[in-house]
Amino acid sequence: QRQMCIRDSHQVATMTLIQAANFIKEQFDIPKTSEEIFNDFQNMVIEEYRNTIPLKPYARELVKWMKRDGYKVAVATANEIHLSEMVLERTGLMADVDTIVSCTMAGASKESPAVYELACANMRITPVECVIFEDSLRAMYTAKKAGFVTVAVYDDVAKDSWEEICRITDEQVVLE
């Protein structure tokens, strides 16, 4: 049983699973290979995404409204695409998403704008035509610095960063 400081947990939140496995192995000197840690993560995560992970409050309504009004919808995730697909399929939103991109596909974590830029390229739009909805402080810094319009979506995981998130984003929403 080991604990991670808030700063590190926010950093891990923007990483791919293999990056997180490497980070955790180094930070906690775990006597497993990074691949074994990754596989442990993967198995736990798959089970959660397949059966449990809920949508954020009102996410379904927002996506449906956006599609109805002719907007394109992308999912840009630090997770692997198949995990996002599990949630989208289970919640009935898969058909409403125009593209799903991952940090792995973009070759960088959300500390780089590459994943957002890839989503834009797939939808044939520019960053100024795109609004990023995010809940991670580091991802918000990245998106804002790259010229995207940003909307912070409150998440209890980032509650300690909420004040800073609000300071740097264009808009904020707290949905319950």
Task: Go through each PLM region and give its residues.
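Short, flexible loop segments at the rims of nucleotide/cofactor-binding pockets, characterized by
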Residues: R50-P54, A78, A108
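Short, small-residue-biased leader/transition segments that mark boundaries at the very start
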Residues: R2-I6
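Conserved donor sugar-nucleotide recognition element shared by glycan-biosynthetic enzymes
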Residues: L17, L55, S112
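Helix-loop "lid/cap" segments that line or gate small-molecule binding pockets
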Residues: T16-I30, V87, A119-C120
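Asp-based, Mg2+/Mn2+-dependent phosphohydrolase catalytic module
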Residues: K64-K67, E80-E176
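A short beta-strand-loop structural module common to alpha/beta enzyme folds
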Residues: R7-A13
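Conserved SAM-binding loop
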Residues: L55, V73-A76, I132-F133
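Metal-dependent phosphoesterase signature
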Residues: F23-E61, D69
